[in-house]
Amino acid sequence: MSQKMDFDAIVIGGGFGGLYAVKKLRDELELKVQAFDKATDVAGTWYWNRYPGALTDTETHLYCYSWDKELLQSLEIKKKYVQGPDVRKYLQQVAEKHDLKKSYQFNTAVQSAHYNEADALWEVTTEYGDKYTARFLITALGLLSAPNLPNIKGINQFKGELHHTSRWPDDVSFEGKRVGVIGTGSTGVQVITAVAPLAKHLTVFQRSAQYSVPIGNDPLSEEDVKKIKDNYDKSLGWCMNSALAFALNESTVPAMSVSAEERKAVFEKAWQTGGGFRFMFETFGDIATNMEANIEAQNFIKGKIAEIVKDPAIAQKLMPQDLYAKRPLCDSGYYNTFNRDNVRLEDVKANPIVEITENGVKLENGDFVELDMLICATGFDAVDGNYVRMDIQGKNGLAMKDYWKEGPSSYMGVTVNNYPNMFMVLGPNGPFTNLPPSIESQVEWISDTIQYTVENNVESIEATKEAEEQWTQTCANIAEMTLFPKAQSWIFGANIPGKKNTVYFYLGGLKEYRTCASNCKNHAYEGFDIQLQRSDIKQPANA
């Protein structure tokens, strides 16, 4: 018996991707859309990540949508980089201005999404058991939104305050407390720097030392802000037509083509200017691809660590042993933090955590660190984490967690073979860039594709196995041209025990990605299996 179609499209997620998908499909294609988010409000990843020090590493005026020119002009810009509360405020403004919340059911986690081949519908079930159907499923589940909780003996018996940075409660006080932080990645660097001046004592449990450069989060003058707003179109166009979408001068100069003195001067200027992506990509064009160039960048940052950190033994612990080939970090005084009398650094690679007890952390050498609060800045099961945790089933009941057992695959980071009419925003093997421009690019491609299916009486559209395999191999080939796979990083899944170390991003840049997506569309969706509408199948509302 044929099922009733409740909606044309169901959108999962209330962040940058989900909000824009709702707007495009509902307001421009005039489809009947229902969206869900487990949070109480919009903002996606930024709704959950409320830890102290939360900050983008993208300049404020570029961490936004390009399509709402009016809102761009009214945007309150105070500093070069935008803090978490201001990201939430901005997305609230977008949602309210465009009345997007009326399409959302908040406080509602989607438990399962199953594809019904007989009716060519997605059947979505919420945590409350409510069931809905739709022709199209858009998953904007978040790149960094599936928390990675450390698997440490005894962690659940800790009787002090235990927090993961991605599930941060309101009104946490550090006053008079002995605080421990596990993790020194991008989140750890931010929270450590913010908490150190507030806590009675802070112990940092470091597994891997990190390369980090100053963020340079300077206040902006009225003249600076006016210049930014007068040049929005140029800056945002620059993003869309660049590799990284950060509107920076992506260098093509080889590091070893200049003298040692000039190289040091270029690095020093970047250090003083601030910004992780600027340091890695605006200084020289081969830091991420040439070992000799990479070592020069490593040595410069290590020299800065030695200059900044007063205790040579602590400075040595903070010296990274890996390549400078992870997502580049930046900070607001991270290395200086270890000059404070109330901060202790524990190298848990050399002296592992044995157990967490009711009141602290026991180390292998017998030391015991008493704590009132333990913060897990241990990151995320990134990119595919939320997909394999959700019950998503495609054709023939194929579970996505099984299909991706040996590592995720996709066509352009948007579609997956065996999962017709399902479109991902920031899915595996999408572009590695400043995220809002990539999100816009993908959502617009998804919207155009759905419009094509409606106008051409298409029942289902699905990436072919060949196109998916070719794209995944392309991503792997490009990654192998860089040094990134040689470093232990979350961008290849190395932060999750047991997770296959594989490619999770397209490293060819946003400009080339947009060209690939455009070529696919302009060549009648080459790489897709397209099935025309059957007479007994209900069509979308505006068909």
Curated annotation (Swiss-Prot):
InterPro entries: FAD-binding_Monooxygenases, FAD/NAD-bd_sf, Flavin_mOase-like
GO biological process: catabolic process
Enzyme Commission code(s) on record: 1.14.13.22
Cofactor(s) required, per the database record: FAD
Positions with a binding annotation for FAD: 16, 37, 46, 57, 63, 110
Source species, domain of life: Bacteria
Name used for this protein in its record: Cyclohexanone 1,2-monooxygenase
Site (Transition state stabilizer): 327
Alphabetically ordered keywords of this record: Aromatic hydrocarbons catabolism, FAD, Flavoprotein, Monooxygenase, NADP, Oxidoreductase
MF term (GO), any: N,N-dimethylaniline monooxygenase activity
Family: Belongs to the FAD-binding monooxygenase family.
Recorded catalytic activity of this chain's protein: cyclohexanone + NADPH + O2 + H(+) = hexano-6-lactone + NADP(+) + H2O
Gene3D superfamilies noted in UniProt: FAD/NAD(P)-binding domain
Organism: Acinetobacter sp
